[in-house]
Every structure is written in structure tokens, then in C-alpha cells.
Amino acid sequence: VRTLARIGVVGVVVTLALAVAVLAHPDTAGDRRARLAITVTPSPSAVTPTETPTETPTDPLVVPTDETTALPEDDPSHDDPPPRRTVTVLMSGDLLWHDTVWASAHEDAVRRGEKQRFDFDQMFAAMKPIVESADLAICHEEVPFATDDQHLSSYPVFAAPPEIARWIGSMGWDACTTDSNHSIDQGYTGLVRTATLLEKAGVRHVGTFRSPAERRKPVILTTAQGVKVGIVGGTYSLNGFTLPPDQHWAVSMWDADNLIAQARAAKAAGADIVLVQYHGGDEYSRLPNAQQIALVRRLTASPAVDLVFAEHAHVVQPITKVNGKWVVYGMGNMVAQSDTVYPRAYEGISVRFTFSETRHGFRVTRAAYLPTSWNFYSPGNPIRVRPVVSALRNGVGDRARLLLAHRMTRLAVNGLNQHGDTTPGLRER
């Protein structure tokens, strides 16, 4: 459909033929990634600072256009102005691999008679088309991967199944932020292994680095339309672990000067849009703390930063605008099995922003969030991550729990607004 919208009258016949071909060969994560060129461009300005398959949603984050801000009109002096480019970016919360998450995936694999140890596809079946629907999808890989023969470990020092990296690629994620308080749970070698496994799966990693040279190269992904999107990130802590002085560059931290310098480097290297991620906040708090608020003010005041998103609190935090730019203070988890005394940790959001090109650069013209929820694992009751709205619509899952998740997520997303008003321009899907 996007192709048809951009082709003139002269190309109608060719367009119709292409449309038939597209219908005959539906897009997949692999196809999309083949069209998404990943560019890593050196820039001298970068600095190094001291849960049975579930329902498939029928409405994958399609946001109505009638209430979005109209773009400026084309210059009337141009008879045939070039088509405006757009890019949709999807971000999701923590992939936090507690041992019961693996146990659920192992149960699915055994039940289906599979040879592999784990089957995460069943757990995320309802989320896959949503991830694939975006031009650029970004996950947060919270913890490092183990080696093939290493003993897996869960909280508090994680070593997750290495098979997850390949699965992340198959889901349709194009990049993962990897900076977190667990980044070096398995030391520098675990950090390197995690980045390398993601790279082999066709997924870029952001926020951790295998060498000083890698840190100096902004991560920029180029879409099929040629839109260059830079991603930078940083974490608040390493959980008391320390890197040796000669490896201090291996993890990006969340101080504003560092993140702004990386954003400027990405813009200098050609990025049209720069997304800044941070990992921080108070765990299980639905509101941002003073550090988050101060950091966001600094980041959004920089012309190099176009949008800020975050995770770590393990519960959903507000979405708002600061200095005229969208900020997602916390997306909650994408999957986890936290202590059940924290029921909101079994909920999260995926957020989707559409950037449209104007004569003054790219700006957000559509913004939406999609509430998600999943169950506590027990043998015979495997985890299923469900988009809340479509699950309610289709009558799948625990209705009472879904209704509560829906209400609590809406309250959290709009938590900074007076009287719980909905954030202007933000849609729920």
C-alpha cells in the first residue's frame, strides 16, 4: 500500500504487477531485514566518557490519522515535489529471562515434539505480527547469554539460553539495546558473547561495545526508503560489578553528557532521526524519579535528540512530551516472571511512533502504545504474552485479569496528567 501511494500515473502498470507479487509473497521478518540496510559509520565526534499458540491481533498498531498534526504543505513552486518519507519505529520493554520463562519454553518444545531445547514462538505468537509490522523494531535484551555448555542462571546473576539470540532475529527485531544493570553479569566475555550472538542473528546491539573502535561508531539503521535512524543508549548501574580500567568503554552509562555526545555523533554521521534509550528508574514505581526527570530534560533540550524511551522499572511508566519531544519513561517488561507480589510486573507496553519527513526534518506524526499482559507460569500453564485489547476483543485469556491490566496500564501511561487525562496525540491500540 505504501508503494502504491508513492508511484505516479506512469508507473501504474508496474505498480499493479508489484502489488500482485507482494500479495503472493507476504512480508516476513527476514524479508524486511533484507530491505533494512544496517549502517555503522565512523564519526570522530563520538566521545568515550570516564508465555498453545495465542490469538493473532487483527489491528497491529494501526493508528488513525484524523487526529494527528498535519504536515506543512509542499512548496507550491514545485510542480512535482518528491514524496515524503516515513518510518515507523516500535520499541518494547525488558526481555527478562527468569528461569520459569525458560521452563515454559521448554515445556512448549517438549509438548510439540521438537528437538530444540526451547520454543519461544508459542509464548510470543500474538506479538510477532506486531513486531513485524514496524519498519524498525527495537527490543531490550536485559541479560547476557550463556555459552552452549554453560549452566544457565537466573536472578540475581543471569546467564540466559543462547538460543534466544536467534529467536530474537526470527521475531523481527532489528536491534536490541543491551545496556542494563545486568550487562556484565557474566563479565566482559559475556558481554562480547551476547553482542556476537545477536550480530549473527542479524540484530544490532546498542549500548554495549566489544572494543573502543566499536564504541566510536554510531549505530545507524537505514530503512528501505533511505531514512537513517540512529540509536544510542546508557544504563544507570552495573549492579556493583566493575569493569577493569582498560575496559571502561564496554558499557555506556546514562549521564546526559555521554548520551548527548553519542546523539550528536550519530547526527554528524548522517542520521535523520536519533532515538535515545536509557535503563534506569526506581523498580516497581509507576512514576519517574528525580534522576529520570532531570536526565530527560537535558536530553530533550538537545537538537540532536528526537525521542527518548526507557525501561528498567519493570512496570509501565508515563508517556508524555518534554521540550516538545516524545518521552516514554518506562515500558515495563516484555516478558518476566517476577515475584507475584508485583502483579504490574506482568504487564508492559509496546510503543510505536511514526516519523514523517517535512521541509524541516523528521517529526513524529503518529504515536501509539499497545498494552500487553502475560500469565504466571506453572506446569501445564505455559506463558502467553497477549496484546490486551485484541485479547479482550477475541475472548482469549483471563478476562478479569486483562481488564485490570488494561485499566492499570492506561493509568500508568497517563500518570503525569492532571485528573488522569489522556496525553494529547497519544493513542491506545
Segment roles from a protein language model:
Residues 3-11, 18-30, 35-38, 43, ...:
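Acidic, metal/ion-coordinating pockets
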Residues 47-49:
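Low-complexity, intrinsically disordered segments with a bias for serine/threonine
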